[in-house]
Amino acid sequence: LQGNKIMNKKTLLYLISFTVLVIGFYYFLFRGTDNWKSKPAIISYVKPFRFLNQDGQVFTDSNMLGKVSVVEFFFTTCKGICPKMNGNMASIFKEFAAAPDFQIVAHTCDPDRDSVARLKVYADSMKIDTRRWILLTGRKDSLYQMARTAYLLDDPKNNVASIEDQFMHTQFFALVDRKGKVRGQVYDGLKQPDLDRLKKDIQRVLDEK
């Protein structure tokens, strides 16, 4: 009987040691890889769209594929939250400038004023690299629909009046992966904790293969 107890203890110790070794093996195998990290959740999908960029060139949902994009909505004459939002966006752009497949896609929420020419002037004044920080204009209803139903940056319930009477003003950013999936969460472009979280999620999505 005493011998059985000793054997059971040895067996238990062997099992514990084996379990620890297996856990350790997989930790070192996947440590630092995308498999070990938690992935930002899929919360929506980019829908088909067709807008014009600051150079008058067509930009569609296909231009999002193969890129990791941060999306925002702003307008060039904004004196309130937009300057701070775009200042924070500039910081994000600088941090990921070395990633060739990273881009910022900024839509106007005031297309009646923000023509292609005005977006170009704004880009020049901000010294934006428009190869990877794209400014878009288009039909107001299409822009607002993308913000609300694809990127989740504004409440669809706000779509209650005629489009001419609506004016969307949102401080939130969205993260889109290479396959057109909206990832992570809706990030507040004015709050540092959200910006820090966004930067971490950008890196996680960039690391995905």
Whereabouts are the PLM-identified features?
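N-terminal targeting signals for export/organelle localization
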Residues: 2-50, 208-209
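Short loop/turn microsegments at loop-to-beta-strand junctions
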Residues: 46-47, 69, 170-172
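A short beta-strand-turn-helix
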Residues: 49-68, 93
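Short active-site neighborhood of thiol/selenol oxidoreductases, capturing the structured segment around
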Residues: 61-89
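Conserved helix-turn-beta segment immediately C-terminal to the redox Cys motif
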Residues: 67, 85-107, 124-127
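Thiol-based oxidoreductase modules, predominantly thioredoxin-like and allied folds used
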Residues: 101-114, 131-141
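Short, internal strand/loop/helix patches
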Residues: 120-170
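Thiol-/selenol-based redox modules, centered on thioredoxin-like
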Residues: 159-209
